[in-house]
């Protein structure tokens, strides 16, 4: 039994592996190259495939997903012009941002804009009257 070197070269493409009791003859037809590669080598990853996966996750029915949240945000912002401007204005900004993230771009932007106006009026201008 060999301890330091398990592979004993016999000829150009033939190896003898000694595992103790019996040996195994390994023949390789690789034109003189003796490198071993692992079976875990995967094909290269392309980042462009990932955008296609994300498009498939969202179907056409979810386009109006944030519209209800957008209307709620707009209502909060408009009500904040008359009642509790700091509290409802901040709520309108936060809910408007959530609506924008969910696809209601216009409603979310209007809710955030009106909420900012109401917040500025409530903090800086109304206390002086």
From Swiss-Prot:
Region annotation Disordered: where it falls in the sequence? 44-63
GO cellular component annotations of the record: plasma membrane
Report the InterPro entries cross-referenced here.
YqfX-like
Membrane topology category: Multi-pass membrane protein
Keywords assigned: Cell membrane, Membrane, Transmembrane, Transmembrane helix
Give the source's domain of life in one word.
Bacteria
Q: Where is the composition biased (Basic and acidic residues)?
A: 46-58
Subcellular localization: Cell membrane
Q: What is its main location?
A: membrane
Q: Which residues cross the membrane?
A: 78-98, 109-129
PANTHER family from the UniProt entry: MEMBRANE PROTEIN, SMALL HYDROPHOBIC PROTEIN-RELATED
Tell me the protein's name: Uncharacterized protein YqfX
Q: Which organism is it from?
A: Bacillus subtilis (strain 168)
Corresponding gene? yqfX
């Amino acid at each position: 039994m060999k301890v330091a070197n398990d592979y004993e070269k016999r000829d150009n493409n033939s190896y003898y592996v000694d595992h103790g009791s019996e040996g195994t003859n390994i023949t390789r037809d690789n034109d003189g190259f003796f490198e071993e590669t692992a079976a875990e080598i995967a094909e290269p990853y392309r980042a462009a495939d990932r955008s296609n996966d994300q498009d498939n996750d969202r179907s056409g029915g979810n386009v109006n997903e944030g519209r209800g949240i957008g209307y709620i945000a707009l209502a909060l912002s408009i009500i904040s012009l008359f009642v509790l401007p700091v509290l409802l204005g901040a709520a309108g900004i936060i809910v408007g941002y959530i609506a924008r993230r969910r696809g209601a771009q216009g409603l979310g932007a209007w809710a955030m804009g009106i909420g900012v106006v109401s917040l500025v009026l409530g903090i800086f201008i109304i206390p002086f009257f």
